[in-house]
């Protein structure tokens, strides 16, 4: 179905993919660069404020000899935010010859493997992040596994969107579904404040398998949105790595001053 393929096409896996191969010979002489995606605000007016949220972690990476890059793009009104974010990152890296580490926090985890499938990546870092399942939307993972912390904002969004989720999952598995059906479902998702807030959860991961790339998964022990137990279990099962647990770190504050040094250490270890 087109709903399942559009993320793949928008991520540029066949178009922009491998452009960076031209500069790989020079990469060994350049420091590894860390890349974060930042969702742009309307007209970019408050992008500077969102950028400040990354100041502590990027400063800690810089102390360790690793430059950082913030890639801005908007996902407002997008049917395929994961694919769009991946496409923006791949495009931004076209002329970058450094080795690259991409870092995803929270729902950003859903776009990371799309970038790794499109161009050479030195390392992928999931931070309190969704770990996508090839061939499935992340919302389906949330139905079969206890991803959200009970009573959390994420949990409330999932429960408020349940009827839409049920219909969506039924539709994408219906071989007789038409483009009109898919469009109507997307309109329902966009019109629902709860479902719309679950950015990228209703987008089917177009990959057949997660790319084989060096991977780090960092879990804050006090994450109040994504259950640390789920994050750590999924890291072992789906990513094949032992998660790094930062004691006391919550869902969003893990990149701020108190925990930034520990996070940076986890990100750069072994590079």
Where are these predicted regions, by residue range?
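Flexible "cap/lid" loop of the alpha/beta hydrolase fold
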Residues: 126-156
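Short beta-strand/loop motif that positions the catalytic acidic residue
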Residues: 217-219
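Conserved loop-alpha-helix segment in the C-terminal half of the alpha/beta-hydrolase fold
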Residues: 222-246
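N-terminal export signals
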Residues: 7-27
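Catalytic histidine-centered segment of alpha/beta-hydrolase-like enzymes
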Residues: 249-258
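Conserved alpha/beta-hydrolase
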Residues: 56-78
């Amino acid at each position: 179905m087109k709903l399942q393929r559009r993320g793949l096409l928008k991520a540029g896996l066949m178009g922009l993919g491998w452009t960076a191969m031209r500069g790989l010979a020079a990469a060994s002489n350049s420091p590894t660069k860390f890349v974060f995606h930042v969702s742009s605000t309307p007209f970019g007016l408050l992008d500077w404020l969102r950028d400040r949220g990354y100041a502590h972690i990027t400063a800690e990476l810089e102390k360790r000899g690793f430059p950082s890059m913030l890639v801005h793009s908007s996902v407002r009104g997008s049917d395929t935010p994961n694919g769009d974010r991946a496409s923006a990152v791949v495009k931004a890296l076209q002329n970058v010859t450094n080795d690259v580490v991409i870092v995803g926090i929270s729902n950003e985890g859903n776009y990371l493997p799309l970038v790794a499938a499109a161009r050479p990546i030195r390392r992928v870092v999931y931070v309190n992040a969704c770990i996508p399942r090839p061939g499935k939307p992340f919302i389906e993972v949330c139905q079969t596994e206890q991803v959200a912390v009970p009573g959390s904002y994420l949990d409330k969004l999932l429960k408020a969107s349940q009827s839409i989720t049920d219909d969506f999952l039924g539709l994408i598995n219906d071989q007789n579904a038409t483009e009109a059906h898919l469009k109507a479902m997307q309109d329902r998702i966009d019109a629902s404040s709860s479902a719309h807030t679950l950015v990228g959860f209703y987008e089917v991961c177009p990959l057949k398998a997660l790319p084989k790339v060096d991977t780090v998964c960092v879990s804050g022990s006090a994450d109040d949105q994504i259950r640390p137990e789920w994050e750590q279990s999924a890291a072992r099962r789906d990513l094949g790595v032992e998660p790094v647990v930062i004691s006391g770190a919550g869902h969003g504050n893990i990149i701020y001053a108190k925990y930034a040094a520990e996070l940076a250490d986890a990100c750069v270890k072994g590079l």
